[in-house]
């Protein structure tokens, strides 16, 4: 475990904020072989889970003790990608390389797999539950959004109106609708879970490529424009889109993104592989702050919120799980 205090990056070109802040980074090296944590998840008991994509494992970190446990998945080279817990403490994950969704029961170690009913849905990507316990997910290369009923294993797949848009990150609004990035286009999709109908919002710049996505308590959608180096804001009620240049510029590659309960947007710039940057954006002031990730990050692909003032990051290339404590 490595603990580092990091003040905001001091250069004017990298910091536009009324006052510097401090973030405390703590990092743990995962035991996977090879180590490559792709996505993190946080559970109410304080445990941090991750997909060990290249080692074909689901892992768990206990931050209080620094101890790890990993479960090897039954399908070889399944490429675990996204993951999310259910209300009973089971961990659901996408087998991105094997066209499946899996469920791990940590109490028993039992793993159940659900194959996609359509072979073209080859790469399930990001999973998310609704309040009724139904699991929704994106399928990137197959160009689907799907729903899995855990009660009977039934899977429904729906394609967006536009072909080959590569659905990526997905979030749920207070309305119950889901919003997802269409990474191979300048579109954000909206899924109505009752009808499985999909509406698309066209982003103003044709070269925009939204990758990860977040939503605030006002149902405003935030996304990182990976191709152009912008933070984007979409109001689905009006279809209005606003863009904010990322501090690192056009090649900053905004990726992992969350919105905390105080409406602050946090995201990671990944344009320089060994110099990833954590960015804080205040929508009220339109100001940004940045912090260099101590060990470089090596592409932070996703992050989640843990306890108040706490973010959890998966540093894929470093093989590390990181906690960013906001002071």
Report residues per predicted region:
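Bacterial N-terminal signal peptides
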Residues: 1-4
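A short helix->beta-strand "capping" segment at the edge of beta-propeller domains
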Residues: 15-34
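A short beta-strand motif characteristic of beta-propeller blades
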Residues: 26-30, 69-72, 112-116, 154-160, ...
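Beta-rich, blade/repeat-based domains predominating
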Residues: 33-45, 76-88, 119-132, 162-175, ...
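Conserved beta-strand positions in repeat-built beta-propeller and related beta-rich domains
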Residues: 48-54, 91-97, 135-141, 178-184, ...
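A short loop-to-beta-strand structural motif that recurs across blades of beta-propeller domains
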Residues: 57-60, 99-103, 143-147, 187-189, ...
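Short loop/turn segments that connect beta-strands within beta-propeller blades
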Residues: 62-66, 105-109, 149-153, 192-196, ...
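Blade-level signature of beta-propeller repeat domains, shared across WD40, Kelch, NHL, RCC1
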Residues: 298-327
């Amino acid at each position: 475990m490595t603990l580092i205090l990091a003040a905001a990056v001091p250069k004017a070109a990298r910091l536009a904020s009324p006052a510097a802040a401090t973030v405390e980074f703590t990092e743990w090296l995962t035991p996977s072989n090879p180590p490559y944590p792709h996505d993190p998840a946080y559970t109410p008991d304080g445990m941090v889970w991750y997909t060990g994509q290249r080692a074909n494992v689901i892992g768990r970190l206990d931050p209080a003790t620094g101890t790890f446990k990993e479960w090897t998945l039954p399908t070889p080279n399944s490429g675990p990608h996204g993951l999310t817990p259910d209300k009973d403490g089971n961990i659901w994950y996408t087998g991105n390389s094997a066209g499946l969704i899996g469920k791990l029961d940590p109490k028993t170690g039992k793993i159940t797999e659900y194959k996609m009913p359509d072979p073209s849905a080859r790469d399930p990507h990001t999973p998310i539950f609704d309040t009724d316990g139904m699991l929704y997910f994106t399928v990137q290369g197959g160009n689907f959004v799907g729903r899995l009923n855990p009660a009977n294993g039934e899977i429904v797949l729906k394609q967006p109106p536009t072909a080959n848009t590569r659905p990526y990150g997905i979030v749920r609004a207070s309305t119950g609708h889901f919003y997802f990035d269409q990474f191979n286009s300048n579109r954000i999709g909206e899924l109505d879970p009752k009808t499985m109908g999909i509406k698309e919002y066209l982003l103003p710049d044709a070269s925009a490529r939204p990758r990860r996505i977040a939503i605030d308590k006002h149902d405003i959608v935030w996304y990182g424009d990976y191709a152009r180096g912008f933070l984007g804001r979409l109001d689905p009620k009006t279809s209005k889109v606003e863009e904010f240049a990322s501090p690192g510029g056009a090649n900053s590659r905004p990726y992992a993104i969350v919105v905390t309960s105080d409406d602050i947007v946090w995201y990671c710039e990944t344009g320089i592989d060994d110099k990833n940057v954590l960015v804080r954006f205040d929508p009220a002031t339109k100001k940004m702050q940045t912090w260099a990730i101590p060990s470089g990050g090596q592409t932070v692909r996703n992050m989640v919120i843990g306890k108040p003032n706490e973010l959890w990051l998966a540093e894929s290339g470093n093989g590390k799980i990181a906690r960013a404590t906001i002071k």
